[in-house]
Every structure is written in structure tokens, then in C-alpha cells.
Amino acid sequence: MNRRHFLQTSAGAALTSCSTFSEPDALIIDTHQHLWDRGVISPPWVKGAPEVLRHDFVTADYVKANAGLNVKAIYMEVDVAPKDHVKEADDIVAQCRAGNTPTIAATIGGRPASEDFETYVKRYAGNGIVKGLSQVLHGDSTPQGFCLSPEFVRGVRTLGKHGLNFELTMRPTELKDAAKLIKECPETRFVLDHCGNGDPKAFNPKLGPGLKRSCTVDEWKRGIDAVAASRADVMCKISGIVAFVPPGKWHAEDLAPVVNHCLDTFGPDRVFFGGDWPVCLLGSPVRGWVDALKQIVASRPARDQRKLWSGNAIRFYGLKV
């Protein structure tokens, strides 16, 4: 589909079925909000990140970035050093309890394979704010297949035992491992973050070279299909992919193949939106990502769009909004 046809069909569909989400007061649940104040906790990776991310990003900045949108957010851990996990989690829980922030819940960081993991989990289980946990699995220091190690599987099972979910942030080449992990942990609910790290540049090489951890389009699609089929309650977070494209050189249709495959494979009841701010700034301000996604889904039924933007997240995370 060429860009002109994409824009024409999207615009026409928007007039017939998407007016709800062109209104500024339509609720958006951002399931993937990052915050860091280096005076409190400094994620180690920030020092080597692109310059746009080598700053503090606090609630006031998030509010400014989302001006004009009716947003409530779920904090997403920022890959701090393990020694700072408790400090990070305690800080965001305190912010949520203060009630003066759009952040209403949290996915905290942790190490499921650690010996004291259950003690850590018990500290936050049942507090009403912490909904789950994640560990970044696509870093160079994490070996391939790590998520299937006995210690890791044991830890992820522990989350389900205490009513918490696990969010999968991993290499697209290992999505079939994710499907195996899900089957090994039947009592734990899962979210696949960032569309399984699908890279839009794999669909359109004109956008530039793909990431070193990228895979072929067919391999990524098979991985997404495997995760979706692994269990009927696995969710997919439509997030992260705008960070892969060059700023100012992409259009909504460049993201559409990744988004649409995830939406079609998981179905309208198993997807929700994530802003990935401020990491999204590698490709776009968060408003640019929101506008692009609205355009991509414009032809879908309004009820499905409501599920994507807010309804599914409210249900899955048990949010009170």
C-alpha cells in the first residue's frame, strides 16, 4: 500500500468509525511509562544511551509530553541495578499512593532467578499498586535461552502464586522461548511487550539497517503467532516500535505492518497501548506515536479501539479509574 492510499483510507475510516479517539478527553491508559531521576536512582544504561535520553525524566515532564491527552499511566521498570530494585519499587509505590500523579500502578523490576526472589515478591504482592514484574531479557549480558533456565522458570511461577504477572521484554529471535515459558507457568499471567520487539525496518529497509537483534519478518511473525497461541490469556502491548525508526523520516504506514500483525493475531481483547516514553523519543515524541497509532487503527471498530486504548488495560491490570 502506498502512502497516499494509506492516508486516504485511514482518513475516510476515521470519519466513519474513529471520532471517539479524535476527542482529547477520550481516556488512554499508557501501560508503559518510564521515569527516572538520577538524583534518586540512575539506571546504569543511561550513561551510554543516545543524548536524548541522558536526562532526568520525571512526572512533570511526562505530563508536559502528554499535554492535551487524558492519560493514566502504569509505570514500567527502567532496568536499574539489582541493588536498587527495592528503592525503585518503593519510590514508585510512594508516588502512586500520593495521588498527585497520572501514574496509578506499576510493573516493577526484579530478578526471578535470584535465590531471595520470593521474599522480594512478598514485599509488594497485594498492595494494590504493583501489578507485575519484568526483567529486560534482550541485553547483551543475558544469554540466549536464559528465560527457560530452571531458576528463572521457578521465579516466574512464584509471581503467579502471589497474583502478579510477568512482562516479557526480549529479543524477537527468542519469541518461541517465550511461548515455552508461558506454557511452563500456567498460573502466571503474561504480557508481551513492544510487539515482541518487531522492527519496522525489517519491513521497509529504506528506513535504515535493522537492529543487530532483529530477525526476518517471517521469523518474527512465527514468533508472535507462537506466543499468541501459547495461551488464550496472554496479552500483547502495542508499544516500543517507534523507537526503532529514524526521527522525522517515517510515516504511520511504516509502523502499520508490525501493529496490524499483532492486532490481528492476538485479537481485539488481548492488546493494549504503551507509550514507552521517554524511550520513544529515539523515534518520535509520544504524541507522534499516539497520532500514528490512531491513524493505523482508524478502520477498526470503535469498540475495539476503546479496548486498545483503555478497556483491556483496565480489565487486565484491575485498574480503578
Annotate each PLM feature:
Residues 86-174, 180-183, 196, 214-215:
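Active-site gating/metal-coordination segments in enzymes
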Residues 47-83, 101-111, 131-138, 164-166:
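Divalent metal-dependent hydrolysis catalytic cores, especially in the metallo-beta-lactamase
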Residues 83-102, 186-192, 251-264, 289-296:
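Short, electropositive alpha-helical surface patch
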Residues 32, 73, 106, 159, ...:
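Conserved, mostly hydrophobic/aromatic
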Residues 28-38, 192-195:
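Histidine-centered catalytic micro-motifs
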Residues 3-21, 26-31, 40-41, 47-68, ...:
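Mid-to-C-terminal alpha-helical segments outside catalytic/metal-binding sites
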Residues 146-272:
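Catalytic pocket-lining loop regions of alpha/beta-barrel enzymes
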Residues 36-39, 80-83, 113-116, 139-141, ...:
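Active-site environment of divalent metal-dependent phosphoester hydrolases
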